Amino acid sequence: MTSLTVIDDLKQTLRFTQNALKRKAAYNPSEQFNEIQIETVSVCNRSCDFCPNSVLAPPAARMSPILLQKIATELADMDYAGKIGLYLRNEPFMDKSLNDHVRLFKKFCPKSFIYIASDGDLVTVEKLQKIFEAGIS
């Protein structure tokens, strides 16, 4: 009886492995993730208690346009249609090129939902109009 159990276990393992290989063969990179957040600048105008920046703020930095273009191109190559958040632990309106970034991702990933999250301190009606014209979702 023990040898039958071992054989049954081996058959089950083989079926499991075959199914896993079939899933891997049908793998679509665009299904790997459905949301990405990109921090284009590392600065924020606040120091919220719940944010890691309140304890250890990163040095002020800006993502290079070359890297941003590379990310947009790679997402386009995947036919990415998920969410793109142009913020992480920063205030997106502190990025003077924010509207350009929105246009870039709208061009390369037209099916994506492009969004930001802001504390609102720097928002004006004019800035809102411009970011919507740029293509923010």
Write out the residue ranges for each language-model feature:
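Conserved alpha-helical substructure of the radical SAM core
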Residues: 2-137
